[in-house]
Amino acid sequence: MKVAVVLIVVLVVMMIGQETDSWRIRIRRGRKIFRKIRPYIPFVIGAVGKRQAGDAEFQAKYNAAAEDGVFTDEEIKSVFGVDDNGFVEFKATYDVDGDGVVQVEEYETVVELTENLAG
């Protein structure tokens, strides 16, 4: 019985050793691959770039609608381009206090929280 326990302990130690060795190989391979593609990363980022939150036309419409601090139903439909079904979902998502009016502050808070949760 003691011999069996010793053999099991030895096998477990050997298995752990094999697992760490296999992780080391994977990490080393990952480092080699990263070293090969690292010089090209700035070119890819420069070509694709980080997408802006919106284009100039959207930004102009948004700023005009946000001047009074409240998005009216017509402003929501024209600025965000939602139809009647999307309008109901938009109100349900961005009307935080449930008063039937989407305020700019509510909209920006929900967008910021969503971006933070998305990463």
Swiss-Prot record:
The keyword Acyltransferase does not apply. Keywords: Calcium, Metal-binding, Secreted, Signal. GO terms for molecular function: metal ion binding. Ca(2+) binds at residues 95, 97, 99, 106. This is EF-hand calcium-binding domain-containing protein 2. Its main location: secreted. It is found in: Secreted. InterPro entries: EF_Hand_1_Ca_BS (IPR018247). Component of the acid-soluble organic matrix of calcified layers of the shell (at protein level). Residues 82-117 form the EF-hand domain.
